[in-house]
């Protein structure tokens, strides 16, 4: 049986009468690419915000490895090895590409410059280290954001709609990059591009109305009648 690096049990977060996340059980296996999909309002972003500590848990528990991290704030979870790249690009536009990544490098990484350049090389931006981040194309800003995440040397990398706004050619390059991260890094992918999800993920979890509708391989999810009903046959239901 594959080991589990990140798990949630009974994870719940309500906002007034809205059951954004409602008793979710979830397992992320070490070294996998696991996609999280669901219709608009299904609870995807709230769920990963609970995992990363950006939103406090109302009830339930979160475990990283063998450690209960439910009560830890976001910055402490980063130190434990969870990196979360945001749905909207979050680079520092007035700083250089190099300085953006340098801010993310943990003290224990050793010498700063080799760590920064290694992360930039990984995402193909080493030759743009001195460029001001705000002058990068949108696609390159998304790559920079990923480089910042990799500089943290995460055990788990959460990618929230990483291909949003990318050209088709950039999406293909991004997919190749994500594949190169595993099994060293475990990836949780929230993505609206269903073709990419089916091609990239080893397993998929479908959320609907804040609850898990199904979990399985791409083939199992594609054949699941409950998933088909939730999506009403639409191609864009994971947005």
Regions found by a protein language model. Name each.
Residues 2-239:
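Glycine-rich phosphate-binding loops of nucleotide-dependent enzymes
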């Amino acid at each position: 049986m594959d080991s589990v690096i990140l798990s949630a049990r009974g994870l719940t977060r309500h906002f007034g009468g809205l059951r954004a996340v409602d008793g979710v059980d979830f397992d992320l296996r070490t070294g996998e690419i696991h996609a999280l999909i669901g219709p608009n309002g299904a609870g995807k972003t709230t769920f990963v915000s609970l995992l990363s500590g950006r939103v406090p848990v109302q009830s339930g528990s979160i475990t990283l490895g063998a450690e209960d991290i439910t009560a830890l704030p976001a910055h402490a979870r980063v130190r434990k090895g969870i990196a979360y790249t945001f749905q909207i690009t979050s680079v520092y536009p007035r700083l250089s590409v190099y300085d953006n990544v340098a801010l993310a490098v943990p003290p224990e990484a050793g010498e700063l410059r080799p760590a920064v350049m290694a992360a930039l090389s990984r995402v193909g931006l080493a030759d743009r280290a001195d460029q001001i981040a705000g002058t990068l194309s949108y696609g390159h800003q998304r790559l920079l954001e990923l480089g910042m995440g990799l500089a943290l040397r995460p055990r788990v990398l959460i990618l929230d709609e990483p291909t949003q706004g990318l050209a088709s050619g950039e999406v293909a390059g991004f997919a190749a990059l994500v594949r190169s991260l595993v099994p060293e890094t475990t990836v949780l992918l929230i993505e609206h591009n269903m073709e990419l999800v089916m091609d990239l993920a080893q397993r998929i979890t479908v959320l609907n109305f804040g609850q898990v509708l199904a979990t399985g391989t791409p083939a199992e999810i594609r054949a699941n009648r409950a998933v088909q009903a939730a999506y009403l046959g639409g191609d864009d239901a994971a947005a």
